[in-house]
Amino acid sequence: MVINFEELHPQERAELERNIFFSTLEQLKGWARSNSLWPMTFGLACCAIEMMGVGSSHYDLDRFGSFFRTSPRQSDVMIVSGTVTKKMAPIVRRLYDQMPEPKWVIAMGSCATAGGPYVNSYAVVKGVDQIVPVDVYIPGCPPNPAALIYGINKLKEKIRYEARTGKQVTNK
């Protein structure tokens, strides 16, 4: 349908200009993906308690379009919170591999980002980024639910930026 703006009444033209947005398909997909993130919770330690708090009524992650999923096949974001041991590392990788593309990873807390206070243990992985590519790091021991919401918003910005520019800003 072609609209000739010269033939329209000035009020109609102004209304159309306010309500019609021009974009690329990639930007539209990026906007849709960023506003409908479905994180898979992978709580391994005390940070998981803070992650559960995000789903409570006080913070209500649902209002941002994110719904916690329990299956990796229904998720596009993996939130790793807590200490990742060498025994747990293959399971984390398997769950990541089961997620459909596009997929993102958030490392929540000191243990997931760099090993935390257990970094010198022989059984602890020195950061989940040694197993799967991480897109957003959330520091803290443990980080509060507001920090997780901030991290999810940063991931949304990253998704939109990648869709807008065509540049991938990941370490994949």
UniProtKB/Swiss-Prot annotation:
Top enzyme class, one word, equals translocase
Where it sits in the cell: the answer is:
Cell membrane
A Gene Ontology cellular-component term: plasma membrane
A Pfam family (short name) is Oxidored_q6
Q: Which UniProt keywords apply?
A: 4Fe-4S, Cell membrane, Iron, Iron-sulfur, Membrane, Metal-binding, NAD, Quinone, Translocase, Transport
Q: What is its main location?
A: membrane
| Name the record gives this protein | NADH-quinone oxidoreductase subunit B
Gene symbol here is nuoB
